[in-house]
């Protein structure tokens, strides 16, 4: 009887871990996961608006990447450095639609600011945590993100 309860409890734990909250946190095969989100680097180069539109077509809730911690920036910079042969990639912060009100394209709050305002769109460098404002019509690779 004791052995049956132990085995049953073990199976229950496995079942709950597979069917509970963790089950919905899987990213598609070619996406990388970090802190409840899925990320993917795209090598093709597009202007900011086309890259954002492309991201929204990849998965429900997907946008150009937004950053909310230094650790998240580090993760994406490492991922992009390994994948891209270019120095810059588009990120989701802009002030295209709101004049001087900078915001992330996914609607989340702008937690910190690490750039000089010169153009309306931002790129991040593939080898450090610097952000640069660039002409939105320039073409760069980009990273998409969605909540798992």
Swiss-Prot record:
Expressed by the venom gland. Keywords: Disulfide bond, Glycoprotein, Hemostasis impairing toxin, Platelet aggregation activating toxin, Secreted, Signal, Toxin. Residues 34-145 form the C-type lectin domain. The keyword Plastid does not apply. Disulfide bonds join 27-38, 55-144, 121-136. InterPro entries: C-type_lectin-like (IPR001304), C-type_lectin-like/link_sf (IPR016186), C-type_lectin/snaclec_domain (IPR050111), C-type_lectin_CS (IPR018378), CTDL_fold (IPR016187). It is found in: Secreted. It comes from the Eukaryota. GO terms for molecular function: toxin activity. Glycans are attached at residues 47, 137. Pfam families: Lectin_C. Its main location: secreted. Residues 1-23 form the signal peptide. Snaclec that induces human platelet aggregation in the absence of any cofactor with the EC(50) of 0.25 nM and causes tyrosine phosphorylation in human platelets. Antibodies against either platelet GPIbalpha (GP1BA) or GPVI (GP6) inhibit alboaggregin D-induced platelet aggregation. Only the combination of these two antibodies completely inhibit aggregation, suggesting that it acts through both GPIbalpha (GP1BA) and GPVI (GP6). PANTHER family: MANNOSE, PHOSPHOLIPASE, LECTIN RECEPTOR RELATED (PTHR22803). This is Snaclec alboaggregin-D subunit beta. It comes from Trimeresurus albolabris.
């Amino acid at each position: 009887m004791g052995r049956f309860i132990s085995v049953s409890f073990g199976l229950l734990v496995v079942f709950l871990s597979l069917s509970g909250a963790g089950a919905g946190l899987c990213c598609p095969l070619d996406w990388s996961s970090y802190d409840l989100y899925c990320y993917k680097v795209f090598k093709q180069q597009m202007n900011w608006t086309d890259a954002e539109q492309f991201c929204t077509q990849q998965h429900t809730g997907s946008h150009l990447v937004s950053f909310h911690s230094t650790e998240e920036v580090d993760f994406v910079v490492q991922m992009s450095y390994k994948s891209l042969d270019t120095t810059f990639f588009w990120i989701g912060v802009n002030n295209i639609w709101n004049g001087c009100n900078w915001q992330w394209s996914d609607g989340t709050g702008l937690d910190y600011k690490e750039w000089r305002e010169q153009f309306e769109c931002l790129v991040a460098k593939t080898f450090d945590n610097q952000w640069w404002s660039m002409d939105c019509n320039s073409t760069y690779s980009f990273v998409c993100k969605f909540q798992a």
